[in-house]
Amino acid sequence: MPNISIAFDLYGTLLSTDAISDQVAEMCGDETKAKQITSLWRRYQLEYSWRITAMGIYRPFADITEAALKHAAAEAGVPLSTEAVAALQRSYDALSVYGDVEQGLRQLESERREGGRDVRCFIFSNGTAAAVSASVASSPTLSRYAAVFEKPPLSVEAVGAFKPASAVYDHLVAEATASRSGSGGSGGDGAVGVDDVWLVTANPFDVVGARASGIKVVWIDRAGTGWIDRLGEVIGTDIGPTHIEAGVHEAVLRILYSYV
């Protein structure tokens, strides 16, 4: 069986940002406003990353996240102190995993230990390598399975652009297919073919960006809405996920069973 590489998006795929709304509510004292701020924060976080990439400029994701939070709070009419902004920024280093994640990581740990092939796993994120490493270290679940993932994590900072820029996915493919000495599995040298690189993500923009670059993708559809993104139709190739699953564990099984 071939060696395979599986990349996992971090924020919103492995780690849940749902608890952030509760922290915002504690600070502003209004649950409705807190939900509005949290929703706008994520919206502007992504929008800013896309805009700055389109301008050919790069700044760390933490800087964009902070600016997006200030924008969201201002739009909601809720003043946030410098201390509150800093505290909410730190919340990204204290996120919990989704309930479907640990079983998937346990499956990968078993596969890497007992399987007859090399399964390389990466965290692939808009965050800097340092920020991603901090998030993993502070997560009780991810830190317990840290050995499952290659180090350092794959960050877009290496190419100075954010998802879904094509250069980001080219970087993923280059790293995920690189040979490494001393690897197990049937490949001998640890080499992975381009056709055996997978991305697991809950973000539709990530799906379309990766598929446009020829990467297989399992989309995590926790809301059960089905695939409704239509940008693939605009591109002209009707791009969509390779597979759709309800959680990370199901995604891992789908990928591994594709080679049975």
What does each model-found stretch correspond to?
Residues 22-23, 40, 67-71, 87, ...:
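Alpha-helical elements of Rossmann-like donor-binding domains used by nucleotide-donor carbohydrate transfer enzymes
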Residues 83-94, 101-140, 152-156:
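Substrate-recognition element of Asp-dependent hydrolases with the DxDx(T/V) motif
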Residues 23-24, 49-54, 227-228:
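A short acidic, helix-capping loop that chelates divalent metal ions and anchors anionic groups
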Residues 1-46:
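Active-site neighborhood of HAD-like aspartate-dependent phosphohydrolases
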Residues 35, 43, 47-88:
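A metal-dependent, Asp-based hydrolase signature
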Residues 124, 128-260:
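Asp-based, Mg2+/Mn2+-dependent phosphohydrolase catalytic module
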Residues 21, 25, 38, 42, ...:
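An amphipathic alpha-helix signature
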